[in-house]
A protein has these predicted regions:
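N-terminal Rossmann-like dinucleotide-binding module
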Residues: 1-34
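Beta-strand-loop-alpha-helix segment that lines the small-molecule cofactor/substrate pocket
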Residues: 54, 60-61, 65-112, 127
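Short, well-ordered coil/turn residues at beta-beta hairpins
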Residues: 58-59, 177
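Predominantly a Rossmann-like dinucleotide-binding segment in NAD(P)-dependent oxidoreductases
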Residues: 111-199
């Protein structure tokens, strides 16, 4: 619903044509709430039946690649929620579909457009911070684990927990601020155990 709410703030630029959700009742509610002409429970049917300029993919992570690729192949531009997909091979398939279609594919890495990131970018470009050669990031979440027990905490559907969900923003902003340098070396480690109880 967050994407639809944002799009509805741009009535001169965006007309919401159709809404798709595997839960039909929710699709109908969202279509009614945002004056969409149609609702669907299958994105393939939506792409077959509707003439769309842009598709916004805001599904569980494991569905990003199939939905985005289908939309690109149907001739639509695509805004896909982050992370792009679960594996580099799937992301490459998305890029290949974009290149073949001639359409645009944007991943929702919105933090680079925040005021703080834009200010930091200006400072970096002006040389106010010297040569940037290292970035260290962290994120503390005080509101618990979102969607515990649902797709968000199921690795096969989410892809790997906080690093892929939240860490991707920091990786993106760090690379953006440094001008997307070619890495010399990369190392990493993930840990995806969730506590049974919150303190």
């Amino acid at each position: 619903g967050k994407h639809l709410a944002s799009y509805s703030l741009l009535p001169d630029d965006i007309q919401i044509i159709a809404v798709c959700d595997i839960r039909g009742e929710r699709a109908d509610q969202m279509a009614d709430a945002y004056n969409a002409e149609a609702s669907y429970t299958d994105y393939k049917e939506m792409l077959k039946n509707e003439k769309l300029d842009l598709v916004s993919v805001a599904t569980p992570n494991h569905m990003h690649a199939p939905a985005a690729i289908a939309a690109l192949q149907a001739g639509c531009h695509v805004h896909c929620e982050k992370p792009a997909s679960l594996t580099p091979a799937l992301v490459q398939s998305m890029v290949d579909a974009k290149n073949q279609s001639g359409k645009k594919l944007m991943i929702g890495l919105n933090n680079r457009f925040t005021n703080w990131a834009q200010l930091a970018k200006k400072w970096v470009e002006a040389g106010r911070l010297g040569e940037i050669y290292h970035a260290k990031c962290g994120w503390k979440r005080r509101r618990g684990i979102p969607g515990k027990g649902g797709w968000f905490t199921t690795k096969a559907q989410s892809g790997g927990g906080p690093l892929i969900d939240l860490g991707v923003h920091f990786l993106d902003v760090s690379n953006y601020l440094m001008g997307f340098p070619e890495p010399v070396a990369v190392s990493g480690q993930t840990y995806s155990k969730f506590a049974d109880k919150q303190a």
